[in-house]
Amino acid sequence: MAKPGNKTATKKKVKKTVIDGVAHIHASFNNTIVTITDRQGNALAWATSGGSGFRGSRKSTPFAAQVAAERAGEAAKEYGLKNLDVEVKGPGPGRESAVRALNNVGYKITNITDVTPIPHNGCRPPKKRRV
């Protein structure tokens, strides 16, 4: 017969609630990455155009960025987010559609900032493509 031992009770993991967050939208020419973080920068949810089912040249469309932003927004809803600051980085085609999609999900967008890195004549850029 088994001895009745001391069983350690497993604690239920409690989801933290965050009211204000930051949506980082990285829109490159090939893909769009949407990450939603809290104010300290801890990631709550993220989604990409490629991970949303788009492949090849369809990954770099505004619609793919919209779907990625909707998926990240819905995943971050379970943390109780209400307000978002949006930081947009990069020259890609999904910049504006991702911001609109986050607005349509139901977040109150308080601030939109462009944080695209601009070199002060730093590294030499890659050579131009000859097609």
From Swiss-Prot:
UniProt cross-references to InterPro entries, sorted A to Z: Ribosomal_uS11, Ribosomal_uS11_bac-type, Ribosomal_uS11_CS, Ribosomal_uS11_sf
Signal sequence, start to end: none
Recorded GO MF terms: rRNA binding; structural constituent of ribosome
UniProt KW keywords: Ribonucleoprotein, Ribosomal protein, RNA-binding, rRNA-binding
One GO cellular component, as annotated: ribonucleoprotein complex
Intrachain S-S bonds: none
GO BP, one annotated term: translation
Coiled-coil intervals, chain numbering: none
Pfam families reported for this sequence: Ribosomal_S11 (PF00411)
Record HAMAP family: Ribosomal_uS11
Stated role: Located on the platform of the 30S subunit, it bridges several disparate RNA helices of the 16S rRNA. Forms part of the Shine-Dalgarno cleft in the 70S ribosome.
Similarity field: Belongs to the universal ribosomal protein uS11 family.
Subunit structure: Part of the 30S ribosomal subunit. Interacts with proteins S7 and S18. Binds to IF-3.
The name this protein goes by in its record: Small ribosomal subunit protein uS11
UniProt organism field: Cellvibrio japonicus (strain Ueda107) (Pseudomonas fluorescens subsp. cellulosa)
Gene: rpsK
